[in-house]
């Protein structure tokens, strides 16, 4: 269904066929359907067959998942003494991808309006604007009483209330909510529930590793009233479609090695906000418990509405592996987050794995290599012949001595290590069998050296039109977990390209400026070091890199005062000229650079714009935040060899990760010294993007391109008719601020070049009420196809380069685990929210901090955030930012996170978004910058120990204000001026100008605000920790986490404080991995898996007895399960999984039976 040519999805679906399928399914259910000739003819022919199907077993069989869910509900609510509602088995099942989109509109209408949604067919796909434009997390999450405690940050719901809500959801849905939009124009519209079956990933598979090789998914059945079918279109677009749940081939229990053993259900029922507390069975206030009074889960007046008539999500679950959810709203964010919640539930019960609120990307450094280069300097130690031998199954060797890729022969060409690339004659030359061979150098082709180093002829991001771009095979997988809303999860994987600005290179006076440049080239730099070391250097020496020149011209504590004074006296314009000439200079110029760099004559006088080979020379600049007025951009010149890092997105929001002992891997990874590593998988097929910067026309090029093509699912934008679009585009100046794709899309629509009635613009968000006026929504959204799926050749090339670099064959497994953990926080100065509430400042963070494990866990436990456009309010987002979406006690997630960090030996860094301190607004500029820096750092430079020893990280200082001292220990370490000068030189021409001292030290911006921020953070730490103590879930925390929570809440634990040596030793890897509680987790994982596999065998045998036709298929499954059972039951299994996180026994210990 994916159209590679158009770069989008749904246009390749045959709309007519899907409509015919919808008609057929309606007819089978005895419903009226919109008529068309094709369907009429088909139904006449298929009449007898339809009668047979109606009588068939499938039509009247309860889906296996529904049987599992019903068994759970009957057992769970047996004590209530009331009827348990039956899960509907006559729903309209979306068993084909795209069917939900067709059902969302009447076939001959361009819009559909109802109480909960306004929907439009637009030029770019579909636009759905739900009643609310964002979600809230305040008072929303309710959990039904069970053996597993309900955390204090959730509202506890009595079983009877959930049961009555469930009845009202299924039996009390208003008639108009049940109308399927597709049939809305029929005389008798179809009123029905619509459902979708999904199998979202929970545990990624690890190829070749026994016990970890099978990818495992949970199962979920999602029910919505008919007119909310667009919510299922949305969910399907993100998580996929697992087909008809009634069919045996789709029964998760018949795929036991690919199933976690867990099942879930979700029901949309916005009408439930009208139910009263009394109707739900909540007690009168005179009979209520203290918790019920505190949470308002009781009533005084009979007409009081449940949850005060506001949105809520209600869970019922225990540790048996079944979860059911009722959602009293239809905002898309709730639907997506519900699937996330159920993935998280399954991961926490299964073990080995985590569901993470994370973004991430494989990031490879990239450089401008100029107009010519020799491959030998980039592929030292690698031979073309050896590469060919190891890649027999994936490449075709040509007789001229090069090779092409079997899968992408036109886009990927493998060349020998002695290749010479030259743009001037568009050639790649190399020796083969004693003679020189030559092939044509063409754009957009990956020329791959034997070590995976990739060279591409490129025409953008350069100071001249054509250049050679080199991409290293060495990579860093930057993983951004525990990242708050608006903290930059998506940005870590976005190319920085969109943020780069280009401008011409100027001189004030050519003769004088060239003379100043030559003086720098002739300057004696040998005595620059303060320690007296003599190191002669000549800038134009071909052995001197551009990075060395940047270092040479950047003030440093390593240099003498005289040298620092000298380079500080050089004007930025002259520095830019020096860098420009250095980047262009070739050895055969023999020192004569002045004749090659020219200016035009204008009106008889020399101009100011420099040219090379007749083309204007360009410089590139990058924004890093705003000045204090919050409108003036802080823009800095990039190095002349700058190219954005080559990024491959691995995560965006919902990540399934598994921690695997390194000893089990079949091939090497970046760091074999660690006990374990984390392997991640993106659970989403499409990404629910919020393109904040698209409101600035022309800035977000990717969004503007996406909005120029059809097939998208869009929300919270303002629809425009052709007339409205005509008025919108009359402002020609602003129209031409868009990039060409968006501008042309609008112009084509206005010109009537298509049948669409509506269009949206990427900068024109939905108008929503704010007080007495309408303003643009701050939460515009659209579903973007995953970049790695949009460009499969680039994805393939990324992993191929890594495989070649590691010298492993094309048949061996390739592992790309996480290398760096870089979480994100969203900061803010003191603010007043739209509802008038004052938001306290969160202004203590520098651009980047490093935390030792206790302080990192404190960050993760509270997950504080400033205001975000995604939701209402600010404050704590709960443990690991998953508070609102965790149906089990958060200590389970925190235990897993802590163990994962220890097993894998990861270091915890946290970057800033929105603000650095109260006065430097940075938006997502830091989020984009960090992966660029990290990709260019050597592996040892990424280690905190090295950074601290070399002065690149410093402990945050204690700060005193109004006689009170605030300990810097809570804030860990932060980057220094030395870090900025040293590591930013890989990106910027003048790195010392990018991050001034008060940018790196927020207390210098405003001490009062800094102190208030610290107070706010301390109070939140204490308050959140007290919740774990009050609800008793602290007892489920592993020993170091338990001690930390008590210290956060009370200041000490068993005589230990956060500074105590014995407390900090509790986090020592050797202590943790040799502890009894860790060993118990491994045994728990073994016991659970043995029990599950035995249950699987019983189900398979039962199914064979009931359905003999499946005997051949199921016998294979039985053999595989028996083999797995034998291994899992062995002592070998316990030894093998040592280094994994095992399974947390806490939820199971809570169960009373």
UniProtKB/Swiss-Prot annotation:
Principal location: cytoplasm
GO molecular function, one term: phosphoenolpyruvate carboxykinase (diphosphate) activity
Keyword annotations of the record: Coiled coil, Cytoplasm, Decarboxylase, Lyase
EC top class named in words: lyase
GO biological process: protein heterotrimerization
EC number: 4.1.1.38
Cell location: Cytoplasm, Cytosol
Coiled-coil features, chain-numbered ranges: 1085-1131
Any single Gene Ontology cellular-component annotation: cytosol
Reaction catalysed by this enzyme: oxaloacetate + diphosphate = phosphoenolpyruvate + phosphate + CO2
Protein function: Inorganic pyrophosphate (PPi)-dependent phosphoenolpyruvate carboxykinase, which regulates the carbon flow of the central metabolism by fixing CO(2) to phosphoenolpyruvate to produce oxaloacetate. Can also produce pyruvate and diphosphate from phosphoenolpyruvate and phosphate.
Subunit structure: Monomer and trimer; forms heterotrimers with PEPCK1 and PEPCK3.
Stated family: Belongs to the PPi-type phosphoenolpyruvate carboxykinase family.
Protein name in the entry: PPi-type phosphoenolpyruvate carboxykinase 2
